[in-house]
Amino acid sequence: MVAMDPTGPSESIYNLIPSDWKEPPQPPRYVSIFKATVKDDMQKFKTAMKTMGPAKLEVPSPKDFLKKHSKEKILPPKKKFEWNERRKPPVPLRTDHPVMGIQSEKNFINTNAADVIMGVAKKPKPIYVDKRTGDKHDLETSGLVPKYINKKDYGVTPEYICKRNEEVKKAQEEYDNYIQENLRKAAMKRLSDEEREAVLQGLKKNWEEVHKEFQSLSVFIDSIPKKIRKQKLEEEMKQLEHDIGVLEKHKVIYIANKK
């Protein structure tokens, strides 16, 4: 087989040289990285002998052949019926005749008439007719009669709601009292002259101590810790001077009561 080079000239003596064509090697086969995991899961959740049955099945013996009536259901043995309840008295015989000739002095006509006269007349059930053909319906359950608005407790607030409103009102009063008590405890308290003077002297004493420590610093501040210490002392002195100025300027001072 002669291979033609498409990039070179169309005709060349070198094109007549036969070339050995080799089949390129196949790429490696794809193997999933989850193959072992899937295999383990299949072994874990697989039910044994579910599709093909057990590996070895015991062959029935020729001696245990199917016998006649062996598949029929065997009924339980019969039990004797026993009646434990008390029996009724026997029916009278044909030869037994009732006692005849017994008379009563009760006047059933007058008794029935008196019962009718003294009895309460039955009231007809109220009905209504909604069609000309005479279709009757119960009037009480129809909703046409004002039944509930005529009740004694109609429009009256139920007892449980009144009780609940009282509980809510009581809880609100307790909450308001609690808030007022906290506000009273956290009210502003006036600082007395003795306490103001004691606080002022304490601040001045602290300022003197910080100022003395500031004067003890070295002349040359050539390190970061020294600079930080100097800045800290300057801030403390500045804050103390501000507090002293406030106390000296204002004679009446109120503070928050934290008790």
Curated annotation (Swiss-Prot):
Residues 76-88 have a biased composition (Basic and acidic residues). Its main location: cytoplasm. GO terms for cellular component: 9+0 motile cilium; acrosomal vesicle; axonemal B tubule inner sheath; axonemal microtubule; sperm flagellum; sperm principal piece. Keywords: Calmodulin-binding, Cell projection, Cilium, Coiled coil, Cytoplasm, Cytoskeleton, Flagellum, SH3-binding. GO terms for biological process: establishment of left/right asymmetry; flagellated sperm motility. Residues 179-190 form the IQ domain. Residues 1-26, 76-98 are annotated as: Disordered. A motif (SH3-binding) lies at residues 86-92. It comes from the Eukaryota. Residues 163-258 are annotated as: Interaction with TRPC proteins. The IQ motif is involved in calmodulin binding. Microtubule inner protein component of sperm flagellar doublet microtubules. Binds calmodulin via its IQ domain. Interacts with TRPC1, TRPC2, TRPC5, but not TRPC3. Interacts with CFAP45. This is Enkurin. It comes from Bos taurus. The gene is ENKUR.
